[in-house]
Amino acid sequence: MEGERKNNNKRWYFTREQLENSPSRRFGVDPDKELSYRQQAANLLQDMGQRLNVSQLTINTAIVYMHRFYMIQSFTQFPGNSVAPAALFLAAKVEEQPKKLEHVIKVAHTCLHPQESLPDTRSEAYLQQVQDLVILESIILQTLGFELTIDHPHTHVVKCTQLVRASKDLAQTSYFMATNSLHLTTFSLQYTPPVVACVCIHLACKWSNWEIPVSTDGKHWWEYVDATVTLELLDELTHEFLQILEKTPNRLKRIWNWRACEAAKKTKADDRGTDEKTSEQTILNMISQSSSDTTIAGLMSMSTSTTSAVPSLPVSEESSSNLTSVEMLPGKRWLSSQPSFKLEPTQGHRTSENLALTGVDHSLPQDGSNAFISQKQNSKSVPSAKVSLKEYRAKHAEELAAQKRQLENMEANVKSQYAYAAQNLLSHHDSHSSVILKMPIEGSENPERPFLEKADKTALKMRIPVAGGDKAASSKPEEIKMRIKVHAAADKHNSVEDSVTKSREHKEKHKTHPSNHHHHHNHHSHKHSHSQLPVGTGNKRPGDPKHSSQTSNLAHKTYSLSSSFSSSSSTRKRGPSEETGGAVFDHPAKIAKSTKSSSLNFSFPSLPTMGQMPGHSSDTSGLSFSQPSCKTRVPHSKLDKGPTGANGHNTTQTIDYQDTVNMLHSLLSAQGVQPTQPTAFEFVRPYSDYLNPRSGGISSRSGNTDKPRPPPLPSEPPPPLPPLPK
């Protein structure tokens, strides 16, 4: 296999006699003209490759295909403008960057006929072009014998410059010369890639007035690259290269960096609008100072940084080095080093983007350091390209840390603002009962307040459970009333006593279930006296029905926040802990006393209501408005109470309430109300624990509310009693 491979490799290297007897020569093409045709085809491939956005490796591979093709075929039979698109189409597939046939044809048309509009894809001309390109691709494959893997000199340039620890200037110049050798000479047909690499490095050494010292073994650097290379061969090929450069027209010396074109297009509008002429003159001056070295330095800026990873990879390494120098320098265009420099606006990428173009004025004795300095001036992107990843990270570590600190400070400020606002709301809530009302309901709350003031406390408390039960129908107005009542009770202890009296009256009317009331009353006396206020419900005694339904509602997140927590905690946005904390500490002693003395009485009736919600709902069937609320509540309270039995508290109810508290707690923490959360957790357990008992105890009152609750709601404050007889 290796022998066959060597023979195949030898097949594509020709002697001078063979080159002089090429098919084109046999068809009467002048030697200089043939070389010019090759250079033009390479120039077209470079232009198309940039427009198609393929890597420089793909472009170089296509150029080698073209050179080899014309050692078998003649330019007279296959014009270069026809073969180049097919060669690039094939190379793109070989290098795993395939492009659509339609795109290749359109780009070729744009490069060859920039003034004409693109052909219609349905036209005969376009279909003919498609057919011709496909046929030419097949011909190229057969001509090349399907030998599509190409070894480029760039890989060996990178290896050698690493080996001798060459400076960046030297490495960049050598790499640039390797690309020029493909575009402008037939070295790829005469010498192996290692030999061409030695020629490029040797030329770069002369260019930069640099001499690579002899190794400690007494060997010259090129002996480590290719043993067949001699100093005489290097001098001969260098001289030939320079002669070709002198003969080559300026328009064929331009080798673009396709990424530079994109960067130039982005800045073209700004540059053209501001000072196009001035910038052009400035760049021309800089180019005249150190033209080719500048370009080479820019193109090669990444080669040295990538060399560390490259040495062991022949093809992939070569591609990486190619891509390195070409693709990673956005601000540069490739210009082959030439004795004279010209910017010609006739070619595709030659608009005022010439900012990125670098002409090459070949004065060999130029100093590499000057070239590198001017290269820094010409290309803003080069410095960044030269920095290794570690250096870049170290360089920007402080900036990143500062940015991170700024972000953290901003986040902390936002959280503190949220916490401050929440605390203000809570403090305001403690002092002013009206603030406790749920924010979204405030609008509707105002019109209702006068009416609520007129309404009896009993009616308000009865509404509280109704609001909880009648979630869909009258949740909003009832919640408002309930909250008003809650705050009034918290601020005025007399209101609690009045409500107790009212509830007693209702209790007398609904004496049907005293036993249950007594049972629940026990829990209410010692637990609800403290948990009532924290809950922040109407008069802090939302009946068991209400709380059971509310807690079950908590499971229904839609209503849980609107009904249950609107009544049990001031607002979803305010920390339940804060509100409860404030309410509990402000009034717990007083209300506990009042609730103990008074809740015993009114809590009894409310508890029976909870125990017999179904019966009560049937009793209140006559009540148009309150009955549906009771009925809807019945299932929830029943479900909650069923397992609880004596206390009328359900473990599921407790869990639901706990889940809701946890959810609100997470919401508060998300908003940054961190200070209040510890208190929230202190009361979460008592909340749920007392809530269920309270459901029993408070249900005494709220049970009252539940039973009586249907009547008051329909007729509101004045007519609550009339509906009951009905």
UniProtKB/Swiss-Prot annotation:
The record marks C261 as: Essential for interacting with HIV-1 Tat. The modification N6-acetyllysine is found at K390. The modification ADP-ribosylhistidine is found at H487, H530, H556. Residues 560-570, 594-609 have a biased composition (Low complexity). Residues 507-530 have a biased composition (Basic residues). Regulatory subunit of the cyclin-dependent kinase pair (CDK9/cyclin-T1) complex, also called positive transcription elongation factor B (P-TEFb), which facilitates the transition from abortive to productive elongation by phosphorylating the CTD (C-terminal domain) of the large subunit of RNA polymerase II (RNA Pol II). Required to activate the protein kinase activity of CDK9: acts by mediating formation of liquid-liquid phase separation (LLPS) that enhances binding of P-TEFb to the CTD of RNA Pol II. The histidine-rich domain (HRD) region is intrinsically disordered and promotes the formation of phase-separated liquid droplets that enhance binding of the P-TEFb complex to the CTD (C-terminal domain) of the large subunit of RNA polymerase II (RNA Pol II). Cyclin-T1 is the predominant cyclin that associates with CDK9 to form a heterodimer called P-TEFb. P-TEFb forms a complex with AFF4/AF5Q31. Component of a complex which is at least composed of HTATSF1/Tat-SF1, P-TEFb complex, RNA pol II, SUPT5H, and NCL/nucleolin. Component of the 7SK snRNP complex at least composed of P-TEFb (composed of CDK9 and CCNT1/cyclin-T1), HEXIM1, HEXIM2, BCDIN3, SART3 proteins and 7SK and U6 snRNAs. Belongs to the cyclin family. Cyclin C subfamily. This is Cyclin-T1.
